[in-house]
């Protein structure tokens, strides 16, 4: 790991990628990488506070990349809820220069969480009380996200982070889209994906996230993936085996003729009893699962309704289950060249103000 110090920023090499970051962030250690960036953990100088820093990969490589960068930035800036990941800081090298020409990199700083639900499921058996608390926090975060007019669309155990106090945050908004837009294509990991996305219905709503929560909750209870499909068809078959083949009135709602024909070609299936599948589970947990894993999205429970379900009564506190101001997604309809997206991103970065508590940390460090 090579390091060269400049006045405020310093450079270091992490996994053969050059990082250039403010010197208040020290002891960087890589924690993960993907198609859209690398993440390292860091210590805020002079404190014992740890943060996560994400270096966006090729943010201005194309108009598609740049729009995605803008989307992720806007969503993270909008979110202000203790169960949803939000931005602590944004930076780019050469801020003093103030030139768009030198604006080539974007780094996002967020809370560092100890583990994700994947780790938790693999490491330990969770008590019913633990499951209640985790599911409550997921739904509390989702109520906030949905009230902003946003669908997450990629909820899965690895996108839900937990710290040692069992406090939870929903992560990874890069793929989220506003609810009003029609959306297509591959998004969520198949195992947690609602059937209406898989069947390519154009008009789906926020309850696709509730289906995902149902799959996650089932996994928290049993420590096994509920619908581990090897492909779309296998996935759909597993769902039908569990829930039964849908009635004719439901089939009429499916806009995809091929999906409708396929379901009609299946032998009639009665479905399995949730009580038999989740043999030792709290009966109230089973009731909530049945309401979340409802094939008909119009009948599926919402996040707000689920929060008042008797299973979560111990933790329910409507006065702190806040909603969000509407998220402005008008830019989604914009088709701009890279340079224009870059200008918009630069404006968002330079206008950013850290949350008050973190602003105080930064002030004390300086």
UniProtKB/Swiss-Prot annotation:
PROSITE patterns: MAPK, PROTEIN_KINASE_ATP, PROTEIN_KINASE_DOM. Gene3D superfamilies: Phosphorylase Kinase, domain 1, Transferase(Phosphotransferase) domain 1. Its main location: nucleus. InterPro entries: Kinase-like_dom_sf, MAP_kinase, MAP_kinase_CS, MAPK_p38-like, Prot_kinase_dom, Protein_kinase_ATP_BS. The keyword Ribonucleoprotein does not apply. The active site is at residue 154. Kinase involved in a signal transduction pathway. May down-regulate insect immunity gene expression after prolonged infection. This is Mitogen-activated protein kinase p38a. The gene is p38a.
């Amino acid at each position: 790991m090579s390091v060269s110090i400049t006045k405020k920023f310093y450079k270091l090499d992490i996994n053969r990628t050059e990082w250039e970051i403010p010197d208040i962030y020290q002891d960087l250690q890589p924690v993960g990488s993907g198609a859209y960036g690398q993440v390292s953990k860091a210590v805020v100088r002079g404190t014992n506070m740890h943060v996560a820093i994400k270096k966006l990969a090729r943010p201005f490589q194309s108009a598609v990349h740049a729009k995605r960068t803008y989307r992720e930035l806007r969503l993270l800036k909008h979110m202000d809820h203790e169960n949803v990941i939000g931005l602590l800081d944004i930076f780019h090298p050469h801020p003093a220069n103030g030139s768009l020409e030198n604006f080539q990199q974007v780094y996002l700083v967020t809370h560092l969480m100890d583990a994700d639900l994947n780790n938790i499921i693999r490491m330990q058996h969770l008590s019913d009380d633990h499951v209640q608390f985790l599911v409550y926090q997921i739904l509390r975060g989702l109520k906030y996200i949905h009230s902003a007019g946003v669908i997450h669309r990629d909820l899965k155990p690895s996108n839900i982070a937990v710290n040692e106090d069992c406090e939870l945050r929903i992560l990874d908004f890069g793929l989220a889209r506003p609810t009003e837009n029609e959306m297509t294509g591959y998004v969520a990991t198949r195992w947690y994906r609602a059937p209406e996305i898989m069947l390519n219905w154009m008009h789906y709503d926020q309850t696709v996230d509730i289906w995902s929560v149902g799959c996650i909750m089932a996994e928290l209870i049993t420590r096994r993936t509920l619908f581990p499909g090897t492909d779309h068809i296998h996935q759909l078959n597993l769902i039908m085996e569990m829930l039964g083949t849908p009635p004719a009135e439901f089939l009429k709602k499916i806009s995809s003729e091929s999906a409708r024909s396929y379901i009609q070609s299946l032998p009639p299936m009665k479905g399995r009893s949730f009580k038999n599948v989740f043999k030792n589970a709290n009966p109230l947990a089973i009731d909530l699962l049945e309401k979340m894993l409802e094939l008909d999205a119009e009948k599926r429970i919402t996040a707000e309704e689920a929060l008042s379900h008797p299973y979560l009564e111990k933790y329910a506190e409507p006065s702190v289950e806040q909603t969000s101001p509407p998220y402005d997604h008008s830019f989604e309809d914009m088709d701009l060249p890279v340079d224009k997206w870059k200008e918009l991103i630069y404006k968002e970065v330079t206008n950013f103000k850290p949350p008050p508590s973190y602003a105080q940390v930064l002030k004390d460090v300086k």
